[in-house]
From Swiss-Prot:
This is ATP synthase subunit beta. F-type ATPases have 2 components, CF(1) - the catalytic core - and CF(0) - the membrane proton channel. CF(1) has five subunits: alpha(3), beta(3), gamma(1), delta(1), epsilon(1). CF(0) has four main subunits: a(1), b(1), b'(1) and c(9-12). Disulfide bonds: none annotated. SUPFAM superfamilies: C-terminal domain of alpha and beta subunits of F1 ATP synthase, N-terminal domain of alpha and beta subunits of F1 ATP synthase, P-loop containing nucleoside triphosphate hydrolases. It comes from Synechococcus sp. (strain PCC 6716). Gene3D superfamilies: 2.40.10.170, Bovine Mitochondrial F1-atpase, Atp Synthase Beta Chain, Chain D, domain 3, P-loop containing nucleotide triphosphate hydrolases. It comes from the Bacteria.
Length: 482
């Protein structure tokens, strides 16, 4: 949404270079950096053209350089540009739930206008130190493998790594469902520079799984903001801020816990790089913008916990050419509190969620934060799985019988642990027919302790597959016996 401006400050286009536009204003009436400018008129074919752009540079001689948020096709020199006097503003509040917006906060889901009572500018300062919640607390997701091995920080930032088809979307939807049902929270999804088809599929899957209520959008658990691959770099660079602004309202005004999904954080950096080059800035390492650290920081520093509520962010991270030293992912890593890595090997085994228990990390997994019992259990689980991984080559060549008694026991327990890390999801119920399970952290720790202590050595390993807590595994074992 761009605020409707009175025509008090009107400039004229002097140059159009792709998505970058130079505009001349009357002397003494230069718009401020980040102000939204509205260009409306008719193109050469007589068709209406309406473009919103954002001021990025003041060039001198009463000229500004702005970046367009939509295609500049049809713009010509001499066209009028009206200064709105404020940054781009987007609708906020419960009216946004269940709807899809573009970078300007305009609905793009063909469901009509949004009943907006309030809008907020997308450029806002990060919360001050005095407003921040400084004591780290664990955000319980109800997903065993995450809560035990890579606990999420309330108000933290988590990188989600995984190729196509290993279950990123399903984990995202389960988290959206669980924060709504267990924490009374809502979610915001910012689609930054990804495929339009994927955005469409995600929306339809959310309707199928009940995350979005098509008949009554106000009962939905998420708002979606899309700036897809085919859009100009200006839109892709700002859509993350549009989504974040909606999330901040839920946190600061509604005092809720919010999940913010950003897919993909690399595309945000990539768009900034494109814009930087078009603005004529000297490129930095590997061709990225010289302001890379500032750009990423401006987004990431606003994602945090305050005394009122929290924004916990899960960011899909594309690593170009699998090079972790590339400046884009390297800058992002500096802000992350944890990483959730999805493994194709586990997905091939049918173990979902396919979170890699050895490759995923969290800086919350410390005894003074999660407690000694949780920490010891998590490390024991990882040690057992690591030993199993080391023994797999021997098993493949010589067979299980060649192992020592102790190693055979380790393998048996590791296979049970691996299966117990799987879990039926609520959002997958419509596809699998298996009812979803929310497992508390207490039940999760107790279950893994019982497996590792040898209490359940006599139960078959298939009893641990796709169950919630350990009591369900015992009940399943009884059924299998019968």
């Amino acid at each position: 949404m761009v605020t409707t401006a009175e025509r008090t400050n009107v400039g004229f286009i002097t140059q159009v270079i792709g998505p970058v536009i130079d505009i001349e204003f009357p002397s003494g009436k230069m718009p401020a950096i980040y102000n939204a400018l509205r260009i409306q008129g008719k193109n050469a074919a007589g068709l209406d053209v309406a473009v919103t752009c954002e001021v990025q540079q003041l060039l001198g001689d009463n000229r500004v350089r702005a970046v367009a948020m939509s295609s500049t096709d049809g713009l010509v020199r001499g066209m009028e540009a009206v200064d709105t006097g404020a940054p781009i503003s987007v609708p906020v509040g419960t009216a946004t739930l269940g709807r899809i917006f573009n970078v300007l906060g305009e609905p793009v889901d063909e469901k009509g206008e949004v009943n907006i009572s309030e809008t907020l500018p997308i450029h806002r300062p990060a919360p001050s130190f005095t407003e921040l919640e400084t004591k780290p607390s664990v955000f319980e997701t109800g997903i065993k493998v995450i809560d035990l091995l890579t606990p999420y920080r309330r108000g933290g930032k988590i990188g989600l790594f995984g190729g196509a088809g290993v279950g990123k979307t399903v984990i995202m939807m389960e988290l959206i469902n669980n924060i709504a049902t267990q924490h009374g929270g809502v979610s915001v999804f910012a689609g930054v520079g990804e495929r339009t088809r994927e955005g469409n599929d995600l929306y339809n899957e959310m309707i199928e799984s009940g995350v979005i209520d098509k008949d009554d959008p106000s009962k939905s658990k998420i708002a979606l903001v899309y700036g897809q691959m085919n859009e100009p770099p200006g839109a892709r660079m700002r859509v993350g801020l549009s989504g974040l602004t909606m999330a901040e309202y839920f946190r600061d005004v509604n005092k809720q816990d919010v999940l913010l999904f950003v897919d993909n954080i690399f595309r945000f950096v990539q768009a900034g790089s494109e814009v930087s080059a078009l603005l004529g800035r000297m490129p930095s390492a590997v061709g990225y913008q010289p302001t890379l650290g500032t750009d990423v920081g401006a987004l990431q520093e606003r994602i945090t916990s305050t005394m009122e509520g929290s924004i916990t962010s899960i960011q899909a991270v594309y690593v170009p050419a699998d090079d972790l030293t590339d400046p884009a992912p390297a800058t992002t890593f500096a802000h992350l509190d944890g990483t959730t890595v999805l493994s194709r090997g586990l997905a091939a085994k049918g173990i979902y969620p396919a979170v890699d228990p050895l490759g995923s990390t969290s800086n919350m997994l410390q005894p003074d934060i999660v407690g000694s019992e949780h920490y010891q259990t998590a490390r024991a689980v990882q040690a057992t799985l690591q030993r199993y991984k080391e023994l797999q080559d021997i098993i493949a060549i010589l067979g299980l019988d060649e192992l020592s008694e102790e190693d055979r026991l380790t393998v048996a327990r590791a296979r049970k642990v691996e299966r117990f890390l799987s879990q039926p999801f609520f959002v997958a119920e419509v596809f699998t027919g298996a009812p979803g399970k929310y497992v508390t952290l207490e039940e999760t720790i107790k279950g893994f302790q019982m497996i590792l202590s040898g209490e359940l050595d006599d139960l078959p390993e298939q009893a641990f597959y796709m169950v919630g807590n350990i009591e369900e595994a015992k009940a399943k074992a009884e059924k299998l016996k019968a």
